[in-house]
Amino acid sequence: MLMRTCDIRFYKKLQQPQFSENGEVYSHKCQAFAHDGSGGEFVLLEDGSIGLISSEGSVGRVADRLDDLLTFLVNGANIFDFSYTNLYKNKEVLRTFCMAYLKKMRNEYAENRSDWDEIHGALAKKLSVPFTPENLPELAETFYQAATRIPTFICSYKDGEKDYTCDSVLSDIFPRWIGTLLQMTKEDFETLSHK
């Protein structure tokens, strides 16, 4: 149920990240404790915070504590749906996005004759984390603060003679689906988010 609802499945024990066999160097010591549906891994960092090494090559801290991550996921968030940095430049824009996002999720569940609140609420109870979807904007802000906290969690690697750094879990590329959800163009969104 956790994988289907929150896109996370725990390993039986801590292990080396699967993305450590090609000379990847992580800025923090880490051990994988879970994976997502696409093969990315959640890792416990040496300072106790939580990182994500995605299967698409992005890397970053996503929570300061495991409870923060689980609360964020249970209350409706997919990490990558909340990775657009301009969402966080204006609190009203973030709130508007979060409420539209929750409405979309509830509607998708209803189309499948399921109750989003009932399913996620039961899971929150089972995990002993708060179920407060109305606080999703604050939970998203907590995610953003963890992702941008210095020192950030990054990965570098060599390809031949060149050094590379993996992309961050945060992105400044405007996801088209956000514009569709909020019924605005990229330009409209950016104008609003910078007010």
Name every feature range the model reports, one short phrase each.
Residues 54-93:
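Compact, glycine/acidic-enriched structural inserts
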